[in-house]
């Protein structure tokens, strides 16, 4: 309204809602170590007592896809699928598949849970969350992302342990839950044209920030840019 748009309003809509709970991860054998982790959107829960199992390593999403059916029964799949650094960040879409599809594939292979390397290239211990999808008929499993330093540490542990025939075991505690339907809304504003019969031009952006971030980049900046573009049209 302060920018001068007309008929500014909120269009409510219902949406299924998932909320995260407690989150922790630690390697219990053979090299005990706590790790930084966060649940992926739509992850199932391990239960309050958590889940401890052997970790099976896959370098890429394709390697996970090639695993024999049932080969991961009762185990935790770990997929690295290291994202390539680019100036524009364009590789995010390509490497995001491990987050979107990996948990569903692991569930179909019989895995008890899955952890992935965070999709990103920054070396800090803030794991990167995001949504994941499970195909119809596939029961969701606990699914989470490790911070990049922790994912690389886990890779080193697995490589070292394999030389002596040891299995790496991890304990996960993830307690997210689905809380049913809640209400959100689209913010709509209009710039009346000079000819009502000429049709409508739609300018828009989305704000789908996850709870762990501010949404400044995805997509607060984009919303601000599109709003400014619409104002330029209005003021022309």
Which functions belong to the PLM regions below?
Residues 1-76, 80-88:
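Noncatalytic luminal/extracellular "stalk/propeptide" segments of secretory-pathway proteins
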Residues 3, 8, 14-18, 39, ...:
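Acidic/His- and Gly-rich active-site-bordering loop/insert found
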Residues 9-10, 55-57, 76-80, 112-117, ...:
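Structural recognition of the beta-strand scaffold that forms the well-ordered cores
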Residues 14-18, 62-63, 83-86, 119-123, ...:
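Solvent-exposed loop/turn segments at secondary-structure junctions
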Residues 24, 42, 46, 53-58, ...:
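Second-shell loop/turn segments in exported
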Residues 60-122:
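A conserved hydrophobic secondary-structure block that centers on an alpha-helix together
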Residues 98-99, 103, 187, 203-236:
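Alpha-helical metal-binding/catalytic segments enriched in His/Glu/Asp
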Residues 108, 112, 134-186:
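Long, well-ordered, tryptophan-enriched scaffold segments
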């Amino acid at each position: 309204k302060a920018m001068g748009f007309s008929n500014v309003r909120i269009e409510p809509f219902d949406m299924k809602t998932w909320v995260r709970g407690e989150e922790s991860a630690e390697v219990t054998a053979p090299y005990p170590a706590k790790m930084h982790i966060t649940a992926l959107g739509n992850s199932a829960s391990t239960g309050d007592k958590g889940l401890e199992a052997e970790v099976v390593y896959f370098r890429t999403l394709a390697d996970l896809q090639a695993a024999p059916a049932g080969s991961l029964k009762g185990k935790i799949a770990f997929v690295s699928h290291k994202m390539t650094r680019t100036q524009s960040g364009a590789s995010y879409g390509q490497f995001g598949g491990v987050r979107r599809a990996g948990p569903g594939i692991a569930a179909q292979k019989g895995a008890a849970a899955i952890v992935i390397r965070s999709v990103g290239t920054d070396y800090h211990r803030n794991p990167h969350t995001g949504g994941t999808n499970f195909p119809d008929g596939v029961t969701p499993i606990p699914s989470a992302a490790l911070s990049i330093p922790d994912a690389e540490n886990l890779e080193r542990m697995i490589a070292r342990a394999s030389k002596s025939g040891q299995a790496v075991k991890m304990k996960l505690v993830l307690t997210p839950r689905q809380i049913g339907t809640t209400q959100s809304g689209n913010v709509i504003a209009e710039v009346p044209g000079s000819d009502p019969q000429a049709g409508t031009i739609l300018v828009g952006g989305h704000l789908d920030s996850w709870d762990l971030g501010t949404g400044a980049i995805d997509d607060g900046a984009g919303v601000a840019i599109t709003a400014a573009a619409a104002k330029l049209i209005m003021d022309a």
